[in-house]
């Protein structure tokens, strides 16, 4: 009887230990972003992109859609008329590393891209693969805060890790028509694991 009570007390203590050591659930690191900037090289012009990012530990996976438009401005009766010299669409899948330090992060990625360039001067389309590379930084809230609407004036709901970030991105594509560019990045999502 004594040994039975002794074993029962140990099983009770160990079962309590398992219940007390439940892990705290945290959010995934998932965010979307828009980038606006300028590129130069084999392609030049205005660059706009939209990307979806997922991070597991320090590994970052990014799917990106980008467009590069080279405009020429002509004048007709004192009215500026834009003409598209070339337009490029790019679909990219990138893998890389991302490191978070409080309310700041930096990343570097590389991958593969499919590009389609329409040259308006000679009315020809080029399709080719490339190797995109990017390096970037982001600044965001380091702690959970209430989400704010109306330009940050009205707080809504409970404190959340979901929020905005701002950053700078240097990017390039090594391909038949290579380029290098710099842009401003705006993101929305969960930028780090909040507790």
Name each model feature, range by range.
Residues 61-63, 69, 84-93, 101:
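Short, well-structured hydrophobic secondary-structure segments
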Residues 31-35, 76-79, 165-168:
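Extracytoplasmic loops and strand-loop junctions of Gram-negative outer membrane beta-barrel proteins
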């Amino acid at each position: 009887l004594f040994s039975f009570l002794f074993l029962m007390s140990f099983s009770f203590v160990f079962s309590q230990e398992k219940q007390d050591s439940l892990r705290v659930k945290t959010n995934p690191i998932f965010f979307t972003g828009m980038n606006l900037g300028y590129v130069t090289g084999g392609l030049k012009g205005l660059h706009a992109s939209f990307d979806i990012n997922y991070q597991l530990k320090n590994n970052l996976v990014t799917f990106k859609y980008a467009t590069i438009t080279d405009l020429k401005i002509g004048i007709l009766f004192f009215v500026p008329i834009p003409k598209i010299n070339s337009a490029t669409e790019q679909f990219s899948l990138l893998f890389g590393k991302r490191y978070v330090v409080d309310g700041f992060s930096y990343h570097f990625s590389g991958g593969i891209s499919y590009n389609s360039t329409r040259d308006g001067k000679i009315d020809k389309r080029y399709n080719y693969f490339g190797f995109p590379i990017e390096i970037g930084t982001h600044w965001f809230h380091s702690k959970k805060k209430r989400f704010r609407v109306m330009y940050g004036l009205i707080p809504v709901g409970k404190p959340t890790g979901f929020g905005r970030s701002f950053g700078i991105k240097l990017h390039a594509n090594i391909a038949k028509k290579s380029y290098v560019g710099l842009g401003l990045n705006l993101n929305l999502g969960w930028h780090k694991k909040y507790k």
